């Protein structure tokens, strides 16, 4: 069981979450530069996010996975510095192609592709060996060779736009308000909160979750059938999805 979080407040809750049965966390951290972080997130709380990550590691919520959305105006600076920091800290870094979630401005032409991210890594001296997508994970992984001054590790890229993995995706997400989403781009949601508050049994909840999973869309947001547009703009932003 994993939790997606921005890390804020995690320093106070990590141990309790671990005791409650949480296995690991995915922390959104788009830069290790405090000013870039503040601009991207619209809040000057980089130090708080970092404390949250450190507390999660101490609580045993490992491996720590760090997610960063690749943005065109910062990727040249962010990619090498964030990978270097992640390797030194033992975090598993995942870059994510910018997806059309919520009402945000988005265009396919503005995407920082997986290939461009790889090119930036190579230009900054990182030696990568492709590992593929083990166990149908969303992220395609690369092994990063160690150097005399830096440990090795892995880095992943979730290329939902330029290298979609819908054909073997088995992921579902429970949102912060109790809605089950079988795809981040899905227009339909399954209300598990109502079942929980209505006293449904574990078996009833599990059955509802299973039925929703069987009807995952064929591809990104294709709730209207196989001839629909492959990308639907969703009504939710990633910050309201959580999960």
Report residues per predicted region.
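Radical SAM/AdoMet-radical enzyme domain recognition
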Residues: 1-96
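Auxiliary Fe-S-binding modules of radical SAM enzymes
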Residues: 84, 88, 98-243
């Amino acid at each position: 069981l994993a939790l997606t979080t921005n890390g804020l407040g995690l320093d106070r809750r990590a141990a309790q979450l671990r005791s409650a049965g949480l296995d690991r966390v995915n922390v959104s951290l788009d830069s290790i530069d405090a000013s870039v972080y503040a601009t991207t997130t619209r809040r000057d709380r980089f130090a708080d996010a970092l404390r949250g990550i450190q507390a999660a590691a101490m609580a045993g919520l490992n491996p720590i996975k760090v997610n960063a959305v690749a943005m065109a105006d910062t990727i040249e600076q962010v990619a090498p510095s964030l990978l270097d920091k992640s390797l030194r800290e033992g975090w598993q870094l995942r870059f994510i192609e910018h997806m059309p979630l919520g009402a945000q401005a988005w265009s396919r032409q503005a995407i920082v592709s997986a290939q461009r991210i790889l090119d930036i890594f190579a230009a900054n001296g990182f030696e990568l060996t492709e590992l593929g997508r083990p166990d149908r994970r969303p992220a395609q992984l690369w092994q990063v060779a160690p150097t005399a001054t830096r440990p090795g590790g892995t880095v992943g890229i979730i290329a939902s736009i330029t290298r979609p993995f819908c054909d073997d995706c088995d992921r579902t997400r429970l949102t912060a308000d109790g809605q089950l989403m079988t795809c981040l781009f899905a227009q339909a949601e399954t209300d598990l909160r109502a079942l929980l508050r209505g006293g449904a049994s574990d078996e009833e909840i599990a059955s509802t979750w299973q039925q929703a999973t069987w009807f995952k869309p064929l591809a990104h947001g294709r709730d209207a059938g196989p001839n629909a547009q492959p990308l639907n703009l969703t009504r939710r932003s990633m910050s309201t999805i959580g999960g």
